[in-house]
């Protein structure tokens, strides 16, 4: 089974969602990216599991294939890793018409994508996401990034892939914690754009048990999430306006991630960020008083955290590095209801107070 979603950006491409797609990578890459050489960029967790079927499929389609592996983890989404991959690609004499294949989760996709965006001022790029979070979110939309000492995703480029190949079978090797972490972005998509999906997830949560019982249903849920992101990205490819809706929970969430030294997964941090902002919105009467409870309950049923022990000052200090900051303001996604969110330009002092209120702490905006 396979579901195909057309992404009609300035450089259109397709996302294929289904099972047994790793073995079809070669023909799919050949048909969309071309070239004669391919470098598979992967990490120490994913490579041993999936690099061989992808390599063999690419070779059967006429590619000369090399594999570049780096240490797994967000802490390696750094300039040193990026430069090492660039050097590897150059040593293997890739041309601009050749292809870099990202095989892994969001970190692999971000780093490999930035390499593809900058090597020889841009070469072909393919995403093969193997985590739930990467399938429903980071592999689609063309964002690539590195983390800097000052904060998350502060260096990067927009670089759309030639094709995205999401083999749902790869999810079977995730731990329950890794699978749950990906659900943070699933819940986010439902909140910002799809009340029906939210209600379906309330009735039947997305879990590894569901994957084992009904892989076709999981594939449909993943495709639905991709379609939500597709609609937003196509309307605003460079994130000047509407695409910022996808950042619901991210300004506080990225700050939590940095405070936790990237030891807490991105999806959990987004879930915490959604909880903070929604609780604050309810206190101000922006949304119904019941909304925070609904979102927190759905997150909890997916194994996600919505609260943390960090101080508002600590989170705010990290959030000052957020890309959505503009001088003394920051663009925040504010929930009004399921499927109804707005992008509000918010003074930093107000943002600090919202964080404090969402944490149940007293506000003190003196830090800004």
Language-model segments: residues:
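Short glycine/serine/threonine-rich phosphate/pyrophosphate-binding segments
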Residues: 107-114, 135-136, 255
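C-terminal charged capping/lid subdomain of soluble metabolic enzymes
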Residues: 184-187, 286-368
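Active-site segments that bind and position negatively charged phosphate/pyrophosphate groups
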Residues: 204-314
